[in-house]
A protein has these predicted regions:
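Alpha-helical membrane insertion/targeting regions
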Residues: 1-150
């Protein structure tokens, strides 16, 4: 029942999708703040919050996946859209591809942080992860617009 409640953005999206979209929209800003903690040499706090953000993101992703499956997936979302199926599907595949690569890089960055710090690669890996999270937010908004606005 909860998964089918109407969202709060005033679109065709269900409530769970609006909740997830709001959280994903905040992710790059939260991550940027955590990155700046490292620049201020607050490394322990940086590591703690980065780990928490990662775990919360995985929980949100799981909530999203359950919700999508519960309401019928991409096909059910496409029923209300005025956008062509193939176009929306390609955008969705791009979004999913970016998300998968970003999660792999983020996981590796967290697990290999000490080693990356020693060889000077952690900072670069962090910025790549930040870029990926930002692209997830942007492509996710694109998918949301195609499925629930147009």
């Amino acid at each position: 029942e909860f998964m089918n409640l109407p969202g709060f953005f005033g679109t065709r999206a269900p409530l769970f999708m609006d909740i997830v979209s709001l959280i994903v929209a905040a992710l790059p800003f939260l991550m940027l703040g955590i990155i700046f903690l490292a620049r201020q040499k607050k490394y322990k706090l940086h590591a703690l919050l980065q780990g928490i953000l990662y775990i919360v993101s995985l929980i949100v992703l799981s909530f999203f996946e359950v919700g999508v499956r519960f309401v019928g997936g991409f096909k059910s979302f496409m029923q209300g859209s005025g956008v062509g199926h193939d176009y929306a599907f390609i955008v969705l595949i791009v979004h999913i591809s970016i998300a998968v690569v970003t999660i792999i890089i983020w996981t590796t960055t967290l697990l290999m942080a000490k080693k990356q710090l020693e060889n000077g690669k952690h900072k670069r890996a962090g910025w790549i992860t930040f870029t990926g999270v930002t692209l997830i937010m942007l492509t996710g908004a694109w998918v949301y617009m195609l499925l629930f606005v147009y």
